[in-house]
């Protein structure tokens, strides 16, 4: 478990040269670098090379190799283009000289324009729901080893309140849909760039697991290997990461050991603040 300040420090990577940055790693329970960390750090690196009047509106990344949590990550930024309204950057992340991730990000000046959005799903509000940890407490007596394993892997810097049972607790097949309220636990003061970096970190949770929902009975007791393959994030409107946000996720398809999921993120007033897509590997150990 890390604190909010430690997360901010993790995402605020060190600048070594104009287009070269080095980041440390969030120590995951499974020993591999968490994809959300690389998303947030790469966005931070790109932001450091962009004019201050431009805000990220989209980022598209590919996870090439699994990262080692014990090795710092080098981020190299290419300044692809600075236009009158848009700026484009490419970021490649390396460990020991090998590329583990690459991303393209686009930044845009503030402009007036037309406005519409889809409606937020009609679900219970967070004040009426338990956190996923509260849901999991029933496991303590029933299966203490599994409970400890789940808690060790849990990013307790964030609060998650699933509208239904937390995905990792489900043992029956269901539709590939999930609605999860989330926020960072501590109140923070941060500009929109840092808010976006923290959202990028958090957006990697629950997406791939949603693709497992129609298959829980088959895989819940199986040894599975999960890994994000790519991740795209669009920022539509400003938001506060320490206020409750609703992550509405669906998985339209799973095939060939890959699951595809997409999510829409709303604030409590129903404002759509971001969209996310991801494809991930869902492979059984043989």
Label the predicted regions.
Residues 1-286:
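Terminal targeting signals and extreme-terminal segments of soluble enzymes
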């Amino acid at each position: 478990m890390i604190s909010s300040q430690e997360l901010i420090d993790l995402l605020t990577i060190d600048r070594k040269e104009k287009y070269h940055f080095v980041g440390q790693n969030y120590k995951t329970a499974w020993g591999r670098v968490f994809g959300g960390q690389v998303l947030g750090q790469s966005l931070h690196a790109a932001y450091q090379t962009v004019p201050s009047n431009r805000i990220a509106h989209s980022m598209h990344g590919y996870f090439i190799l699994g990262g080692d949590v014990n090795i710092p990550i080098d981020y190299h930024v290419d300044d692809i283009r600075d236009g009158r309204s848009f700026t484009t950057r490419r970021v490649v992340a390396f460990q020991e000289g090998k590329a583990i991730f690459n991303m393209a990000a686009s930044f845009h000046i503030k402009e007036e324009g037309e406005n519409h959005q889809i409606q937020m799903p009609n679900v219970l509000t967070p004040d009426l729901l338990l956190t996923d940890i509260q849901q999991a407490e029933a496991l303590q007596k029933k299966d203490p080893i599994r409970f400890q394993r789940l808690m060790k892997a849990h990013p307790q810097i964030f609060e998650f309140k699933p509208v239904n049972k937390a995905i990792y607790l489900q043992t029956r097949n269901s539709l590939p849909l999930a609605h999860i309220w989330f926020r960072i636990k501590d109140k923070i003061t941060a500009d929109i760039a840092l808010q976006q970096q923290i959202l990028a970190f958090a957006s990697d949770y629950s997406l791939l697991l949603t693709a497992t929902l129609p298959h829980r009975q088959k895989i819940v007791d199986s040894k599975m290997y999960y890994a994000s393959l790519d991740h795209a994030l669009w920022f539509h409107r400003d938001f506060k990461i320490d206020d409750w946000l609703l992550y509405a996720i669906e998985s339209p398809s799973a095939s060939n050991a890959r699951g595809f999921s997409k999510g829409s993120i709303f604030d409590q007033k129903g404002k759509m603040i971001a969209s996310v897509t991801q494809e991930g590997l869902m492979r059984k150990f043989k």
